[in-house]
């Protein structure tokens, strides 16, 4: 798997995305994902109210992770309740031990949802994440909202969501913009066509006044679990 507030607190109920990045050696992938399969079929997982995407990383620069768990909850309270429900259970303990035995946890990052547009496929999607430093969040979201509501983007073939970095993350990055689509080629082809439009280029140039891009990650969803519809978090 994207607030108008510059502070780190939660002013209202907002969706939370907790990202766990893992480095897994090829020889251990089968055991790693067998642990995922066992846990997601356990009794304790039946109480899970969020959405957990297992994403495979195709390109993320020098970062060592090749898989990540993108776990999305409708709000912070639901995440906290889930953690309280899991802690101390045998299924949760076995799951964590199995993951640690077959992979290395690289990072944990908490994001808070800001705004989003377009339809998300909950089961299978290709993702492009753009890491950014945003100096004026309200200005940036305002510009992006005007663009997304314009005729230029009426046939955009996917989703765009902006998330604020709330805890953890890469120094300097305070927002991540997530583009989702059926394929990277479809997203890139659409973007290439948009780049020919003078109004689109002007809109992007305006955003660049308050937003600096710091990196990009490409992932694809390998598996999806849980009842939460990601379209409902907006």
Give the positions of each predicted feature.
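Bacterial N-terminal signal peptides
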Residues: 1-8
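Short S/T/G/P-rich N-terminal loop/turn motif that feeds into the first structured element of a domain
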Residues: 12-234
